């Protein structure tokens, strides 16, 4: 209808749609793209499952995926005791956290995004008071 007339008389240069009608298919200026189905019941179910899996990964392993405010981080799946620290990303903060962890670190992963750092460390005897006393530490938990 109206969009085809507007394309024909030059009022509209191009029209992109993910729901082209049969009449729009093959018309110059109509850009037909695949419909991603982001609002279908199936996609909403898939998104809910994905979000639940990501939350489980964070709670059980300290893993962060698809976060708005924290960096992506996938620590090793196997561990005995794990320390997860969210901190303000500033000069020396990460190093001070590592120093507070002491020795006997079996795995250490960290990343930063938008002014926040996230550190995951596997160590057998973390001192939570010493770690939370580091300037810049926002939150710390032991898994």
Question: Where does each model-flagged region fall?
Answer:
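Rossmann-like dinucleotide-binding domain for NAD(H)/NADP(H)
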Residues: 1-77, 118-120, 125, 143
């Amino acid at each position: 209808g109206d969009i085809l007339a507007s394309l024909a008389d030059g009022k509209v240069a191009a029209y992109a749609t993910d729901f082209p009608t049969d009449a729009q298919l093959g018309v110059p200026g109509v850009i037909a793209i695949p419909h991603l189905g982001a609002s279908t019941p199936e996609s909403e179910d898939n998104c809910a499952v994905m979000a639940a899996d990501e939350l489980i990964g964070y709670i059980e392993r300290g893993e962060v995926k698809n976060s708005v405010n924290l960096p992506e981080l996938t620590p090793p799946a196997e561990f005995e005791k794990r320390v997860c620290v969210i901190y303000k990303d500033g000069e020396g903060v990460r190093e001070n956290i590592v120093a507070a962890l002491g020795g006997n670190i079996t795995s250490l992963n960290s990343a930063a995004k938008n002014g926040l750092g996230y550190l995951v460390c596997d160590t057998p005897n973390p001192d939570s008071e010493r770690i939370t006393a580091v300037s810049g530490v926002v939150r710390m938990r032991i898994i």
